[in-house]
Amino acid sequence: MKILGIETSHDDASVALFSENKVEILLTISQFELHEQFGGTVPELASREHSRNLAIILEKLLGKNIDFSTIDAIAYTKNPGLIGPLKIGFLFASALSLFFNKPLIPIDHLLGHFWSAAIENDLEFPVLSLLISGGHTQLIFAENKNNLEIIGSTVDDALGEIYDKIGRSLGCGYPGGPKIDLIWQQNNVRNMELIDFSLPKVLENPLDFSFSGLKTQVINYTNNLKENYLFSQKKVVEIAVSFQKTVIKYLKRQLDLALKTKKNVKTITLVGGVAANSEIRKLIKTYENKYKVVIPKKEFCTDNGAMIAKAAQIFLKFNEEK
């Protein structure tokens, strides 16, 4: 089964050709350098760039002499995401579908992230997945490949969102996640005196997340230093490292709670754009002594067409088995 997957939910235009369990082609054009000057993604600008970038990707695809007659379906991200970029992706997918007479399959972006763990790996069910991205933070429990349940979700900000906001407050630039993680990697964290930011409280659903309080703590602390002329590069490092340390503790707490709730878990996966974070990846690997741990390559953590194609493949096989 061969699927062409198209992802345009945010600022990455990505197209992949996925055959059975192999990514034959993955072409992605990112816009983060364009949006960096604005401190975040500008939807109208993103839509315009997607139109240009998808044309470039199509030209590259055609240059690879792909036999479109062998493709079984064309999949695209339907939602969630920015309306303009999603529409551009839909129009692009629809045009290919009509021209090559192939079925069109709409795919949920978050479902794509979940299945990104299966692009190069076999998942042993039941699976507990931590999905962390710029717009979402979720714990997903899958009893089997056809039965997925969101057991925990953020009630306010997503993790990637607060990384960006705190990165902006510290003057690190956009996107904040990779910038803060780089600070972590470049400093001797073990011997550093850390700031004691408090962990978020347990919510009505203990598996839900709340990051707004932590965000407020960190930004208020930073602003107080600025107002008293005590803000320095040394403080930027201390705040960034202390923030990430608190995030790691919080994610571990939530994962441990989920594993106590779902006692039959065999596999833990880490997916989504923030899954590229080096220390969060290390955290998930600490569970390897009891569970199978699957973390996709970084190219499959960020938004990509391969995860959309993989989700479509699962969908088609499920329908065939009915």
Swiss-Prot record:
Keywords: Acyltransferase, Cytoplasm, Iron, Metal-binding, Transferase, tRNA processing. Its main location: cytoplasm. Its cofactor is Fe(2+). Binds 1 Fe(2+) ion per subunit. Its EC number is 2.3.1.234. It catalyses: L-threonylcarbamoyladenylate + adenosine(37) in tRNA = N(6)-L-threonylcarbamoyladenosine(37) in tRNA + AMP + H(+). InterPro entries: ATPase_NBD (IPR043129), Gcp-like_dom (IPR000905), KAE1/TsaD (IPR017861), TsaD (IPR022450). Disulfide bonds: none annotated. GO terms for biological process: tRNA threonylcarbamoyladenosine modification. GO terms for cellular component: cytoplasm. It is found in: Cytoplasm. Fe cation binds at residues 109, 113, 303. Gene3D superfamilies: 3.30.420.40. It holds the Pfam family TsaD. Coiled coil: none annotated. It comes from the Bacteria. Required for the formation of a threonylcarbamoyl group on adenosine at position 37 (t(6)A37) in tRNAs that read codons beginning with adenine. Is involved in the transfer of the threonylcarbamoyl moiety of threonylcarbamoyl-AMP (TC-AMP) to the N6 group of A37, together with TsaE and TsaB. TsaD likely plays a direct catalytic role in this reaction. Belongs to the KAE1 / TsaD family. This is tRNA N6-adenosine threonylcarbamoyltransferase. The lineage of its organism: Bacteria, Bacillati, Mycoplasmatota, Mycoplasmoidales, Metamycoplasmataceae.
